[in-house]
Amino acid sequence: QPSFILGFHGCQKSVGEAILSGKERHLKPSEKKWDWLGHGIYFWEGNLTRAWEWARARQTEGKIDEPFVIGAIIDLRHCLDLFDREAMRQVAITHKSLTHAFRKINQPMPQNTGPTPDKAGRQLDCLVMNALHSIRGESGQQPYDSVRGPFLEGEPIYAGAGFRSHSHIQICLRSTACIKGYFRPIGQAS
């Protein structure tokens, strides 16, 4: 995994400007039940275009008045890298433990839902990732500062393709110590 990366975060312009001006120190972590990498601050790794697409889509939905993208220099530090087989093994073991726990209390596990192939409503993944971090904390293991994973999104780019039009790498920062600085991407007016 790379150590230092550039991350891009789509947001409301006032939020980005508050960080760049020093009025706010950091972006606020997301704690939505569908945050597929668990709770934390989300970035697109090296993908300014995708961050802009996301911010503009939120404007179209009426969730952002003025779209903006802020960049960050990120040190992944102790990272749960989902490109790594050992990381995936840890996630699978956590899922198995949760399955047993939910069976014991006779409750159904949350599911990943959504009309798209990427299952945009990722409640199950969020539960598993947050549980993995909790289990590590309870057992005295070193906490992960970040999570890095591939997100397959969009339509196939041609018939029979395994590649999708909006696939990207997402980063979830669990520790703001990973952020070495914020910046305004070139070409973005203040």
In which residue ranges do the predicted regions lie?
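Short aromatic-glycine-(Arg/Gly/Cys) micro-motifs in beta-strand/loop hairpins
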Residues: 13-35
